[in-house]
A protein has these predicted regions:
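Flexible phosphate/Mg2+-sensing switch loops adjacent to catalytic phosphate-binding sites
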Residues: 22-32, 58-71, 92-105, 175-176, ...
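Conserved H-loop
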Residues: 42, 76, 204-205
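N-terminal pre-P-loop "Q-motif" helix
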Residues: 3-31, 121
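Conserved Walker A/P-loop ATP-binding site and its immediately adjacent core
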Residues: 46-51, 62-96, 121-127
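Conserved motor-coupling elements within RecA-like helicase/translocase cores
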Residues: 106-118
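Signature of the SF2 helicase/ATPase Hel1-core->accessory helical subdomain module
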Residues: 49-55, 86, 119-227
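Walker A/P-loop
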Residues: 27-52
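Short loop/turn elements that form and flank the Walker-type P-loop nucleotide-binding site
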Residues: 31, 67-68, 112-113, 152-155, ...
């Protein structure tokens, strides 16, 4: 990391590692895992998550390196993903630009490549969008890519739902984004999308993320930075 974490950020990072290890121990297809990571605005959530990604991929005091791990960062606006991507690139001294990918409408792969961070936004995931439809030019939908990767490596595939930097949108647009985000938490039979094995929700207000995970069958663990 190019940035030095404050003590409260280090404490949150250690807690995230502990909860992830616990989630991996508890995980089964019938018991998917969710971690709710809450921190107030300005607490450096993206910096903490960048340190977490580095630790998992490159090794850390809490465990050995897992270089095949994959992270998918989901938000509701492409501009927010771009801001987060730039922050990760500026704060990390280990990830290179080639390791960080913005998923566009042309993306088509059976699996996500190991060792990468992938940014995805809900605006590209509607039923009428190219990423979600098969065609003569597309072999795999994004739902199939997610499902295949989760099945192949359930304990090294991380979905990060960015609730902390939600864009300003109409109620209708916000409801659509929430419905799409819930597919990662609850699965979607019509899309062939299973429940993702481990979802980390990054939020400034726990109530907002709680609405996303309401009625889920997942085990929910909590990490919180005090205000």
């Amino acid at each position: 990391m190019r940035a030095t974490l404050f003590s409260f950020q280090e404490a949150a990072l250690a807690d995230l590692h502990e909860k992830i290890q616990k989630a991996h121990t508890l995980w089964s297809e019938k018991d998917p895992q969710v971690i709710s990571f809450t921190a107030p605005t300005g607490a450096g959530k993206t910096i903490i998550m960048t340190a977490l990604f580095e630790d998992i991929i490159f090794g850390h005091a809490y465990g050995i390196a897992e270089p095949d791990s994959i992270f998918v960062w989901l938000s509701d606006m492409p501009e927010l993903n771009e801001q987060t991507r730039l922050k990760i690139e500026s704060k990390s001294d280990k990830f290179r630009a080639r390791d960080i990918h913005i998923i566009d409408s042309n993306y088509d792969s059976e699996y996500f490549a190991p060792g990468g961070i992938y940014f995805l936004n809900t605006q590209k995931l509607g039923t009428d969008k190219l990423l979600t439809q098969k065609s003569d030019l597309r072999q795999y939908t994004i739902w199939e890519t997610l499902a295949n990767t989760a099945k192949r490596q359930p304990k090294s595939f991380y979905i990060v739902i960015d609730e902390a930097h939600r864009g300003t949108a109409t109620p209708q647009a916000e409801n659509r984004a929430q419905s799409i985000m819930q597919k990662f938490i609850k699965g979607s039979k019509e899309d062939g999308m299973p429940i993702m094995p481990l979802v980390i929700g990054v939020t400034a207000t726990p109530q907002r993320f709680q609405r996303l995970v309401a009625d889920t069958t997942s085990t929910i663990q909590k990490v919180a930075v005090p205000p």
